[in-house]
Amino acid sequence: MLFRSTSVESIACYLIGITSLILFVIFENKMKDEAILPLRLFKDKTFSLIAVVGVITGAGMFGGLAMLPLYLQIVGGSSPTNAGLELLPLTLGIMTGSIISGRVISKTGKYKIFPVIGTILLTATLFLMTTFNADTKYWWIAILSYLFGVGLGHVLQPTVIAVQNAVAKRDLGVATSSVTLFRQLGATVGTAAFISVLFGRVGNETQAAFQNSVTNPEYQKALMDPNNVSTVQQLQALQTGQATFDDTSWLASANRTLIHPILEGFANSMSHVFLIGA
């Protein structure tokens, strides 16, 4: 179930989150060195910087990661299994980035440049993903997925190394796990925000795409085809508000010409999300 960002349910979640954060800080401060996350670690500039970078990159990269399989399934028409297989270039990119950064760091001992390179690459790739539309070819998606993975590979491990070199030996465990914590916090917030933006825009984007399709002869021909009755009924239900985009499974078997405005609406909305992520 989806709620508007200004709904009572959403505001209640905001308040609960803020209250929980305040209570967490209070109790962690009281526990001193026995705290799960000792607040004294934030006095170290490197640790504080990595914490901020972790939240920001976590939001961007995991928000982007959440969009790719959605794009492949909704716009590309792939099954969940095929969408997972089509993301293999992303995994290969992560492996490549991790291996390259790892080998260079082991030989030179220098690691600070890799998070910078990785962040730049992630930003550039997310920006290029704004070119995705309803007719984007898979080879372009695969290339950008690979580059996105390379960027991730340059960020994930070097940031851990940076923190480990900045803190005292007794804090290695908590500092290392904190990197993952900040990244996951960013991922949680980023994914929720990006999904909200996506479904907040998709209605207007789809409506605009339908209006542009009215004069398309192929669309009108498909609209009058008796074989497309079920698709037409589903489209009418969407336009009258009797159906929502919560369930898009019917798109896989629908006439591609008729649902092209929906695919275009989703693609345009996702492009906006990628731009925010960049």
Residues covered by each model-derived region:
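Transmembrane core module of solute transporters
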Residues: T6-V174, G190
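Generic low-complexity, intrinsically disordered sequence content enriched
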Residues: V25, P69, G76, T176, ...
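A composition/secondary-structure signal for short, hydrophobic, low-basic-content segments
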Residues: G153, V160, T180, V229-S230, ...
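Hydrophobic alpha-helical segments of secondary membrane carriers
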Residues: V53, S178-F182
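Hydrophobic transmembrane architecture of multi-pass small-molecule transporters
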Residues: Q184-G277
